[in-house]
Amino acid sequence: MRFFPPLEQGRLLRRYKRFLADIELTSGEQMTIHCPNTGSMLNCMREGGLVWFSRSNDPKRKLPGTWEISETPQGRLACVNTGRANALVEEALRAGTIAELAGFTALKREVAYGEEGSRIDFRLEFDGAPVYVEVKSVTLGYPDTAVAAFPDAVTQRGAKHLRELAKLARQGVRAVQLYCVNLTDVEAVRPAEEIDAAYAQALRAAVADGVEVLAYGTRLDAEGIVIDRRLPVLLNP
């Protein structure tokens, strides 16, 4: 995935009201941009740190800029636009990069399923047999470790998705939880039990019920993002 037009650079002044961020451009101009991330963005940003944003020419938009990449306190880069994860995964699926899911004959997005009113990110078909794939974007890193963690805030919705996947797996349907790690310098992923113990428990229960768990890392810079390698998932770090 290439950023076009190219991203612009600034420095973070503050993030507030969840969806807003004030930045200062290299010219010294200050502007408010949209923050497309509903999470806490823990360890994902710092005041004065570099940010990169895309700019829209749509006159109907109240805020023309969208925050895409952040410099973390550890000096990593994180793609904070969570909406990019599904597009990245679809790109990788169609390219055959995710070997465990290669060879599908059909792909549908945002398909309704389950007993709790969920929508699956991807429903693949392999010779008529469905495979359900739920995607989560991982951006939480810690100092002095190359292990990223998910989630960065309590997520009842994430636990619900795991329950739905587990129900499918118990019925003999292939179900996959896929973590798209949009953070540089990462070698593995784990559940963030210190933030959401219920989610970590739900993940381990889902695996016990037959849900497959995959994690893929990305190569990320201000020019683009691409999924490029599988990462281990540490269920009991």
Swiss-Prot record:
Top-rank taxon: Bacteria
Gene3D superfamilies reported in the protein's UniProt record: 2.40.50.580, 3.40.1350.60
Family matches, as Pfam families: SfsA (PF03749), SfsA_N (PF17746)
GO MF terms, alphabetically ordered: DNA binding
Family of this protein: Belongs to the SfsA family.
Descriptive protein name: Sugar fermentation stimulation protein homolog
Name of the gene: sfsA
